């Protein structure tokens, strides 16, 4: 996978994740019945809004999966852009195209990037499901 990563920021984040897992390994475990993806985290993490904070951020937008993901995905893209001095659009490209990752709102209360294969493989009810209840 690293051979296909040409962006230096993306490459460093992938190498950092690999090094952490090479040294410590990782275990998928559950918290309150949901998988915690922290062991597979790539790059930074950002605290996700509480239900009250999310409702305030949504304002007059419809309360649905797309509008919720728009807010949380923007949070991780903006953090990546801020940390690495890049645009939000380039951050989105780094996440999806360079790293082949998905933004994941974890049971731990943070959003971060995880490899797409893991996000699809480990069945979970994420943040969006919890917020729509």
Where are these regions (language model features)?
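Nuclease and nuclease-like effector domains acting on nucleic acids or nucleotide cofactors
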Residues: 1-102, 106-133
């Amino acid at each position: 996978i690293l051979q296909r990563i040409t962006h230096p920021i993306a490459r460093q984040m992938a190498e950092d994740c690999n090094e952490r897992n090479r040294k410590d390994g990782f275990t998928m475990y559950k918290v309150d019945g949901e998988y915690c993806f922290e062991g597979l985290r790539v790059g930074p993490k950002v605290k996700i809004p509480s239900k009250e904070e999310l409702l305030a951020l949504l304002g007059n937008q419809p309360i649905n999966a797309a509008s919720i993901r728009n807010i949380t995905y923007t949070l991780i893209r903006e953090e990546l852009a801020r940390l690495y001095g890049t645009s939000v659009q380039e951050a989105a490209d780094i996440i999806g195209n360079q790293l082949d990752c998905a933004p994941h709102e974890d049971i731990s209360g943070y959003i971060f990037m995880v490899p797409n294969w893991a996000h699809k493989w480990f069945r979970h009810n994420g943040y969006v499901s919890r917020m729509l209840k």
